[in-house]
Amino acid sequence: MKLFQNILISIALLTQLIFAIEIAENKVDRGSITLNLGDIIIYTGATWSIIDNAYTNFVGKLDVRADAGLYITSTSHLLALQVSLTTILHSITNNGIISFDSRISRTSSSYDLRGISFTNNGEMYFGSSGESSSSTSLTSASWSNTGLLSFFQNQRTSGTVNLGVSMGSITNDGQICLNNQVYEQTTQIKGSGCFTAKGDSTIYIANVVLAVSSKQNFYLTDKGSSMIVQAVSTTQTFNVYGFGDGNKIGLTLPLVGTIFNSAFTYDTASGILTLRNTLLEQKFNIGTGYEPSKFQVVTDSGSGTPSTVLGSVAYYGHVPTRTLPKSCQIPCKPIPKAPGTQPTEYTTTITKTNTAGNTVTETGVVNISTDKAGSWFTTTSIFPTLTTAIAAPTSTAMSTDLSSSVNIPVETSSNESSSITLASSESSAVQTSSIEIPVSSHISANQESSSIGESSVNGSTMISSESALESASEFTIAQSSDVESYSSSEHSITHESSAITSSSTTIETHVTESSVVVDSFTSDSLFVSETQDPKASSFSIVTPSDSIIVNESSIPELSTSVGAVSTSTSSSEISSNSYFPSETHISKVSSSAEPTFVTPSESIIINISEPAVSTDSVQPSTEPQPDMSSVIAESLISSTVSASEIELSSTMELSHSESLLAKQSETINQSESNYISETSAVPTAKSTISDSKLTSTWESSSLVNMESTYSVVISESEITPIPVHTSESATESAAESSDIQTQFTSTWTATKSDGSFVTESGVISQSGTSFTTIATFPPLYTSSDITTEFISTWTATNSDGSVTTEIGVVSQSGTSLTTIATFPPSSTESGITSEFISTWTTTSSDGSVATKSGVVIQSGTSLTTIATFPPMSTSSDIITEFTSTWTTTNSDGSITTESGIVSQSGTSLTTLTIFEPVTSLAVPSYTVIETEFTSTWTTTKSDGSIVTGSGIVSQSGTSLTTLSTFAPSSSSSEIAPEFTSTWEIGSSNESNVVESSIVNQSNESLTNSVSSYEPATESAIVSPSDQVLTSSATSFVSASEFSAVTTTTVDSASASSSTDINNDVTVLVSPSESEINTSSSIWNNENNVSGAVSTSESTSIANNHDGSLSMTKTESEINGFYSTESSTMFVTATITSCNKSDCFENVVTYVSNDSYTTVTTGHSNDNTSVDNNNVPSTLIENVSNTETIPVVTNTEEVSTTVYNPLTSTSTSNIVESSNTSIVDNENNGVHINSDDMTAMVTAVETGNGITNGTNFVSPSTIPNEISETGSPATSIVGTLPYENGSNQLSIENIKYLILVVFGLMMIM
């Protein structure tokens, strides 16, 4: 025997281990899940977040370890959480965080945790909405709390919190927080813990016979909290803290004194407050320092507790200072935010094998969000993959012999070969050229332009970069992919020339026939250069107004060997003997791992990072050696020379180098009226866009204008633009250095008026320090057409680290920004005159301050206003209406938040409508679900009368918007609203079809009106006519998403030609998730040869005080034989439909006498049963509590019993049956009337048996909306709710229960 018991126990433990769920890392589940048999263990450092699983039933022990978490959350307004652990053999142990949060749901939630033991050493949170009565029970036999238990409701209802098994005991050494909750004590309370009442909460000691420890503490935190104790002869003393400011302490009986004692007394020495009902009294240790004159007898009428008239005492004074016990000092924390309840996104990498067998790695962004209905969905965006390919090289021989009016002798020897690679996301174009440049030539560089496509490359090394958009939370970051370049192993160029010109560029370049690119300058002077593809510097740009900067850096470290340069000049000519050898190569490329985020205010910020350069002197010289950051230019040129042709090819993106801004400073040694300047060339660019990649080619030349004997030093370390000066003595006006123009693609973010972020991309042209958006790529959605102009200031960081502030006019159209003009920097020279747009403030004669804008001319330091722009609007004639929320201070000093419709005319605001205050529904901060619902509000007219209006209101967070307003209601019955409805028709000879049409609602009846909808499917519409339901052949397309929904079920029973069978109709109306308009049922008896039985029915719907809706139906025969009346409620249920082992769930709102929340239906034609006269009835598989309608044979008289839960059972005669009877019982038809739950029997042949049209009663309270009508036979199904949305015990559960019961029997 002992051995057998041990075997059973071992099998039970093994079963738990097999089905156990162990969580060792963070996990998020959304939607319905089923917890099988077994324990649940969440290990340290892991969390499990279950979202929108309405029914959660733990069937094993629950163990949450330290620093672990279990979160069960509902984000649905319709379905609240139902969490249970109902087995008595398992325990609950929490050392981490357990949170059950259903605050957003508008239905009642239920938390029922039992088990053999309950131990909480961590934090547990239980949240409900409070719109309807919710229940919370932690009723384990062994109960202990040393941590935090928090019970929260948005508003107080009659629901209560129960702790421990009734008549048992609990041990509380921690903190128990109540917020808008009622704790009802039914056990002994041991320990030295604390009960804290916040908001509208009450601590109700319902059974004083069960002792409460003298070390237990009760803390009332504000004026809405209270404590009520049962008035019995057993007197106890309760430690109460925080009593005062109007909160209450009372008994369950009115406070009545005796001739010896008053109704209450306060001992100022001991601090004991005694409350009495004659001989019954209870004592409260509230502490000392209270003034007896401020005590007052009041009534505590909170819901969920006994409301005793004048049974409580309030103290209308401040709470005297008193030290709280340690347990009451544990803070009552808010309910934590569950992981996964907010829309989120993250980057993921996917590795897979393609068809060629190669491993391909893809990167993308996974976005998890919700739609308007609150349903979760996932979107994955994969970044394009960078692919490269190198083809076989080709050889090309090229020779150049150019001449111009100014000849520069050049001794050149070059042997250059390089490979060109263009990498794109889909294809690659490769060209390799071997270029031979003649030894001697006369070169004159002229500006040209060329275009580089993806299949043709002119030049040497081509750099391809790919732009990847990584989306993260409301903004977009442009990140640059790695740059790949391919060049020949030997790359050497030798040039001899007599001039050095300066060109500023730090992006990847390649060599043309007449120039050499070395780092950030191009030289055709006398020096030897060997170069290898320098990488580009980086920049970042932020457009005005709340944008995000991405700073990326890819900085090559360059080592350069620089020779000596000697120059001699005179006043009449320039002579030079310059030798400037240079050897440059990339020694290291460093790249920052993370982008930097900066948020400026209405500024454009440009950060330029220059390559790190190290120099090495290789030859001595009597002249000072130049720093690598400076280049001596134009040492042998005495006339206008065109030189230094540059061709640039690159794929531009946000990290494009801004060295092409050419913000160079000119150090000018000026003598008398002569001066020298350098004009940087204006590059021409041609771009092609392919696969989100912009490939551009620039060609430019530098034009050097000179008239003097002085040298010009172009210092790249001083990037400070200066304005162009005009001199009459100059032979040719020199343009300022900022004339260099470049084009590149950029991505920026803009903040819309509603606070959302919009990411845009486009082509930006830059001339000097001026930015112009040439083209904006089309956004994914239509942006705003509003165009505004404003003045913005931005800063530019020079190569030497200095910061330059610039200002200009920026135009904004929607989310597109364009720089219209850049203001020149201020100058002390009085001859410089500039015009710009500015904004200023003026003080009117009445002292008010007005803001104006206009065109301002600046001459030196003098400012003159040329023109003033008109104001944005003449204001007063522009009238707009919008929904707004504001706060109002009442006469008692309290602050009330109100919402309504506000009209604005100019700067004047007028409140048109104030919305009705909404019941307290605290929506968590993480909720971003938009909802639409029907609401009613009041409006005060000009004559002071109040008009009630209704309409559809859209809510996004705490913002309310009125979508439409319903026509005013009228007492006249002729006014019948119309709405689009959809219903389902099922019959015995065809499958269910769905139809929609315009339904007219008058009082509580629904009729179809003529519709112009286009026919979509072939079906039937039911219309009443002379107590007989007929069908017409027409159909309609579906209605809009805001339409109410009407579901109609129609069944046609089997009938012969001699019998007129009517359809059996049930109508269900559910317009939205928060409102129900009406529900009614239509049923008519048949006309048969033995007589007609007709019924009439009236339905009324009432709005109850608690906000729920109920429907009262009255049904009677036409001839008045019987009359029934029943009152039903609108109930929300989850329907699980099963076909054998396949089940699916559906949530409906229906009318029922009982508040069923879980209903299961099924159908099978395999099994039949025969009762009495062999009328077949269907047995439904896998459905519990199935009932078959018996058919009784009576040759003389047939009676029916009308079942009504509100009235007594009665019997009435229906019809005589002397002429017709049943012969062929196999062809009989039976179907169920969904209104009064009676069975309609139809006979098709005559004989001895039962009469046509007989009603048989089913003693069932199953909701009529979900009962099924079958053919040729049907049975009524009654179900009982079960955990996790199922009404059946699985085979595994049955086996397990049998095993446990059998084991217990053996032990006993």
Curated annotation (Swiss-Prot):
UniProt KW rRNA-binding keyword: no
InterPro entries assigned to the protein according to its UniProt record, in alphabetical order: Cell_wall_rpt (IPR031573), Hyphal-reg_cell_wall_N (IPR021031)
Keywords: Cell wall, Glycoprotein, GPI-anchor, Lipoprotein, Membrane, Secreted, Signal, Virulence
Post-translational modifications: The GPI-anchor is attached to the protein in the endoplasmic reticulum and serves to target the protein to the cell surface. There, the glucosamine-inositol phospholipid moiety is cleaved off and the GPI-modified mannoprotein is covalently attached via its lipidless GPI glycan remnant to the 1,6-beta-glucan of the outer cell wall layer.
UniProt superkingdom: Eukaryota
Ranges where the record places region Disordered: 487-506
Propeptide feature: residues: 1285-1308
Covalently attached lipid (GPI-anchor amidated asparagine), positions: 1284
Subcellular location: Secreted, Cell wall; Membrane
Segment forming the signal sequence: 1-20
GO cellular component terms listed in the entry, alphabetical order: cell surface; extracellular region; fungal-type cell wall; side of membrane
Upregulation: Expression is down-regulated in absence of GOA1.
Glycosylation (residues): 367, 415, 458, 551, 607, 669, 989, 1000, 1003, 1077, 1088, 1139, 1153, 1167, 1182, 1219, 1252, 1284
One Pfam family here: Hyr1
Its membrane topology: Lipid-anchor; GPI-anchor
Function: GPI-anchored cell wall protein involved in cell wall organization, hyphal growth, as well as in host-fungal interaction and virulence.
Family to which the UniProt record says this protein belongs: Belongs to the HYR1/IFF family.
Protein name as catalogued: Cell wall protein IFF5
Organism of provenance: Candida albicans (strain SC5314 / ATCC MYA-2876)
Chain's gene name: IFF5
